UniProtKB/Swiss-Prot annotation:
GO CC aspect terms: cytosol
Reaction(s) this enzyme catalyzes, per UniProt: L-aspartate 4-semialdehyde + pyruvate = (2S,4S)-4-hydroxy-2,3,4,5-tetrahydrodipicolinate + H2O + H(+)
Assembly, per entry: Homotetramer; dimer of dimers.
Site description Part of a proton relay during catalysis, residues in chain: T50, Y113
Protein name per the record: 4-hydroxy-tetrahydrodipicolinate synthase
Tree of life domain: Bacteria
PANTHER family: 4-HYDROXY-2-OXOGLUTARATE ALDOLASE, MITOCHONDRIAL (PTHR12128:SF66), DIHYDRODIPICOLINATE SYNTHASE (PTHR12128)
Metabolic or biological pathway, per its Swiss-Prot or TrEMBL entry: Amino-acid biosynthesis; L-lysine biosynthesis via DAP pathway; (S)-tetrahydrodipicolinate from L-aspartate: step 3/4
Catalytic center residues: Y139 (proton donor/acceptor), K167 (schiff-base intermediate with substrate)
Amino acid sequence: MSAQNSLFSGSIVALVTPMNHYGEVDFSCLEKLVEHHIEAGSNALVSVGTTGESATLSIEENVKVIEKTVEFAKGRIPIIAGAGANATSEAITMTKLLRDSGVAGCLSVVPYYNKPTQEGMYQHFKAIAECTDLPQILYNVPSRTGSDMKPETVARLAEIENIVGIKEATRDVSRIVKIKQLAGKNFIVLSGDDATGLEAIKLGAEGVISVTNNIAAKDMADMCRYALAGDFDKAEEINARLMRLHHDLFIESNPIPVKWAAYRLGLIKSPHLRLPLTTLSEEIQPKVGDALKIAGLL
């Protein structure tokens, strides 16, 4: 594995952004979360991705959260910045603002709502890559964006030097194989779906960008480590215990359930989210609580 691949591999946390009851970012809590994940053995953190509520933070807030996350990490764990937008100009602005932030790379989502063609996706990511030297990880999540970036488009983008990988969140693990075949073995593929993450690693993915990781960091780190070492029996044992959690953390829109779960476990002080997201429905809370118990976290 190349040095770059090892930087973006293993158990990567799609980190929540803790907030107080007024909707302000709780930076003291964020610092504790960073320490928690370093101690648990997580391999990298994604700051202000989907799970970090990037859509309801201003550009200035996004940049501040990323910079503070880098500051708290003190070089002990790579920080990947969520830097995507559905306007190419906005994504470029965000990416340029991160130039000297100390991040290891950027995670950039397929433009959402406006539903670009495959050529539009290619030109979007090409323009972003050309504005920076930072490594770029593409993010394909059709259930969120309304558009699916095809493996052939990914392969075209893989020819651009600083586009180094993709977070693939279609739940179709056969995509892992096809992207590797078309883009080459050195192109990083990361699963973006906890429930199929282990299967993705078996098929050649370098790791998982995980929501479950927020509340089961050590288990996810161990599972990925075992799987990448080829010890699938031990990896399967952990994954089976977490499977109910993998599913129930999406029982309402992410990051609603995972924020409640992190609050329930005392990892954050409040389950608060910014509107239009609201806290986990009271009638759903016992179900997520049961999943935490099955996982051995309660």
